[in-house]
Design a protein with these regions (language model features):
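N-terminal active-site segment of His-dependent metallophosphoesterases
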Residues: 1-21
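Structural motif
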Residues: 5, 74-76, 114-116, 161
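Active-site glycine-centered loops adjacent to acidic/histidine catalytic or metal-binding residues
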Residues: 10-11, 44-45, 120, 165-166
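Short acidic, glycine-rich surface-loop motifs adjacent to enzyme active sites
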Residues: 13, 106-128
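Short, flexible/disordered intra-domain loops and linkers
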Residues: 17-23, 89-91, 128-140
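Extended active-site neighborhood of metal-dependent phosphoesterases/phosphodiesterases
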Residues: 19-110, 145-158, 173-188, 192-205, ...
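Histidine-centered catalytic micro-motifs
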Residues: 117-123, 162-170
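A short C-terminal boundary segment appended to hydrolase-like catalytic domains
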Residues: 201, 206-244
Length: 244
């Protein structure tokens, strides 16, 4: 089955240093160039450790700013928010630029059709228990501003589905009526007994969204996104819990 498009969610390489990363990104770009389908790229943190967005753009030969793609009955929002992990104080970790958040807010407030939002970093806030990388590094599994991202998603009046990479496992988490998907990595091995997962996914968009992951860590889900949002959560039941 020929896809309508190929979506690269980022982390095309494991970063080493600038010169090595330039070479590795070029090798990956050559492989993508052979595909007989439109390819849309998002930068992950490993693509950004030693390289700029501009360098990634030059290697891939594409623009890597935020973008909306019309898919007919649906639209694809390529939310290419900054995915660089900062390693020096005071802002260690991810830091979501306000400009990226405002762009997403404006885009979703004006959305008129069901929307797939693709990013590198997930924003559902889902549990990282059991995750090899993030159980003990949960702050690096998402943006510190993830709660604001979810508030932005709640502004939309159309069905939404969010898909991300970064956390190296297959998950579905529904928050406020919006399904959040994370896709397993092609080369990850912590869920596959030390061998590469060889994972890749197929997403079919319609009234029901069908997601399949192939390879050695298979997964399948059928989702029915809604334009309705959930009732706001209750306040704490007990004053002691509120104080805590």
């Amino acid at each position: 089955q020929k896809p309508d498009l190929v979506l690269d969610l980022g982390d095309r390489i494991s970063d080493i240093d600038t010169q090595t990363d330039l070479r590795l990104e070029g090798e990956v770009a050559d492989v993508f160039a052979r595909l007989n389908a439109p390819v849309y790229h998002i930068c992950g943190n490993h693509d950004r450790d030693h390289l700029t967005v501009a360098e990634n753009e030059e290697i891939l030969g594409v623009d890597l700013h935020n973008q909306v793609i019309d898919l007919g009955d649906w639209q694809l929002v390529l939310w290419r928010a900054d995915a660089k992990i900062h390693r020096t104080a005071p802002d260690i970790g991810f830091d979501l630029p306000e400009s990226d958040l405002l762009w997403l807010s404006h885009t979703l407030q004006h959305a008129t059709k069901p929307t797939l939002i693709a990013s590198h970093v997930p924003c559902s806030g889902h549990s990282q228990i059991g995750n090899y990388y993030f159980q003990r590094n949960e702050s690096l599994s998402t943006y510190p501003q993830a709660d604001r991202v979810r508030e932005v998603l709640a502004q939309a009046r159309v069905p939404l589905v969010c898909i991300a990479g970064h956390v190296h496992w297959n998950t579905v988490t529904t928050v406020d009526g919006t399904p959040h998907i994370t896709q397993q990595s092609l080369t990850e091995s912590f869920t596959t007994a030390g061998e590469p997962a060889r994972a890749w996914g197929m997403l079919e968009l319609g009234e029901t969204v069908h997601w399949q992951v192939f390879g050695d860590d298979p997964f399948e889900a059928r989702l029915t996104p809604s334009n309705q949002r959930w009732t706001a959560p209750l306040q704490p039941f007990l004053s002691k819990l509120a104080a805590e």
